[in-house]
Amino acid sequence: KSAYKPLPMGDGQKMSLRLQGSSYFQTYSLSFSEPWFGGKKPISFSISLSHSKQFLYNYSTRDVTRNQSFNITSLSVGIAKRLTVPDDYFVLSQAVSFQYYDLNNYNTGLFTFGNGASRNLAYTIGLSRNSKAVNPIYPTQGSEFSISGKFTLPYSMFNGIDYENLGNLAEYKMRATADGFAPDGSNYPAGSYLNSEGYPVANPADAAADPAKVDQKKYNWLEYYKVKFKADWYTRIWDKLVLRSLGEFGYMGAYNNDRGLVPFERFYLGGDGLANFALDGREVIQLRGYPNNSLSSTDGGTVYNKFSAELRYPITLNQSASIYALTFLEAGAAFNEFKDYNPFKMQRSAGVGLRVFMPAFGLLGIDFAHGFDAVPGETVKSGWQTHFIIGQQF
């Protein structure tokens, strides 16, 4: 017994530090998770802090402008608890998050304003049920359901700001930032009020509203709510042949119609689902057979739905590597407003693919998908698209 010296083991806590950078962006993040918060029950606690900086980058000339940047600082604290009612498969999760968006002369068309700050303080609550079995890489039966809501405070209910009238106030009117010339050739000094046609006016009431100033005030503190639902079934058809059926829906709304929907946190549908660009907190939704983000407007959608049916068959399920082939049908759509929502108006696709899971690399895959419909704004159907899968499940 005195010679017995087991390897030291922890209690499952995990701490991660990430540093990433290039000539035009930098990211720093730190996270910690505790699976047995309190030490008695399987209550998961997590906290994360991150900061990223994106410099203005010209993809044609590859020039980086370092005095123009978009900085994001994020803090999130969450807790998740396994429930025993109605059964042991349910998990209730809650989180409070805060993001500080700081734009410094970052005029890329992403927002109407290139200078200013937006703050996003939100509470998220979710209920999920996961009974997938037996192999988490290749489930053969069971299901996973989740419903979640994300809510900010309804600031417009108590801050006393008349958002409908902002454009009529002098401080939110269009003003010249430098000496300039009117359309008729006459000149005007910096600071002059301008009307919608570009002419100087003496009375501020006759000047046009400045969208950048109005939106900066509207989105100083983000105000919205989001609701999402997802249902995922796995059914054994024959031997190891498995049918995966998936349906999901998301909606984003506003408390105050005069304040409107925020340009952050929107849904972008189409493509491989890899979030290569998420400065505005967007949610990227996969739909194979179409280019990335092509099924949403440039501003993103506020409501979407997606349905998928996928047949899978394993080639090998060894511990060192799991490989399976698949074929699928998918359909989905994203809409700018709920009044435009039509659950029967969707872009459709079909295809085949291959997945490889190795413990050292995670999940890798490739899909060949054919889009049967045209993307919004075009008349030619999408046709064949190739999608590479890295680390995420469809």
Sequence positions of predicted segments:
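Short, glycine/acidic-rich beta->alpha junctions
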Residues: 24, 71, 223-227, 345-348
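C-terminal outer-membrane beta-barrel translocator/porin domains of Gram-negative envelope proteins
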Residues: 109-315, 327-328, 335-337, 378, ...
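Generic long, charged, amphipathic alpha-helical segments
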Residues: 321-327, 338, 342
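Metal-dependent nuclease catalytic cores in nucleic-acid-processing enzymes
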Residues: 354-358, 362
